[in-house]
Amino acid sequence: MLTYKAMYKFLDQGVHAEVLDFPGTITSGATLEEARRLLASALVDMAETNLLRGEPLPQPDPSCTDPEADLEEPIHLLLTAASRVRIVPRASAPGNGGTYSDT
């Protein structure tokens, strides 16, 4: 588990939410609860994207702060590993004279 810092700004149009120490993790919601839920989802999406690209996750920085934030709080990133196996028929496997499709 990695613990980052979330910040929220209460605006007339809703709540702006951002993970201060994970660049690009930004969203907004109509309410604080919606913004929290969407920010948690955005954090997972950003982390998975980094990993799929072979990029490291940013290190949490507890010293990150935004003086304009109305609320700052920890946000926890929990990732799980998954395996995916694809069965390729022998005649279609590369090198066996058949055609191969990875779709």
What kind of feature is each model-predicted range?
Residues 23-34:
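A short, exposed loop/beta-hairpin motif centered on an aromatic-Gly-Thr core
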Residues 1-3, 37-103:
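Short, charged, surface-exposed hinge/linker loops at domain edges
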Residues 4, 15, 25-27:
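Structural detector for hydrophobic anchor residues on beta-strands
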Residues 7-21:
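Short aromatic-glycine-(Arg/Gly/Cys) micro-motifs in beta-strand/loop hairpins
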Residues 20-23, 103:
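Short, proline-centered helix/strand-breaking motifs
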